[in-house]
């Protein structure tokens, strides 16, 4: 993009931040520009000013655009092999030191990830009857958090869930959707939080931040991972997405124990 377009983009991001509460300055500039441009073209906007008018006049478009930018693609047991590794290796190692685990799902989207944690823990109680847990789940998107609290899911979100687990932990409705059972939902607290601005309170044994920061600038990622390190208990686990790597993780006090998993040392 030329200099004028850069100025227009900077102007738009400031206006959009004030309108929607999502600060785009922390995201990789060129990638975010391409995503916004593709969305603008799909909506028939002639430029940033025209697109801003569309957003100001249509709250539904604001929500849809935020979802587009924050990539609200979510389903239960995403990357099943990683969840198997979590339940077979990392959680038992944590339970060898304590019976009560605190989990934070940072960037929980519509709730599939924190509910997956809860289902995993419930199933693990067969071998670990003393296991207790609490789950804190946050997202920057108000609509996503509302959907997570509602706990109602269509078939695509359940594609990686074994049928017996669907029968055990969900209730089907006449429309073909499935609602998470209250016994699971009661162990999770959902909250609105911008990872760039919010304070990280509490201490956790597991923090999951998967496929959330892929468009963040590298310096923002590094700062965020440092804050996660501070929020973890000693020996705690940071669970990332399949394409995410912490460069120079040892400088932050992490040990890369396997793909997607970092341990606080």
Sequence positions of predicted segments:
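Extended basic-aromatic, gly/pro-enriched interface segments that bind polyanionic ligands
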Residues: 126-127, 131-208, 212-220, 245-247, ...
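Conserved beta-strand signature within the Rossmann-like core of class I S-adenosyl-L-methionine
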Residues: 234-242
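Conserved class I S-adenosyl-L-methionine
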Residues: 98-111, 116, 136
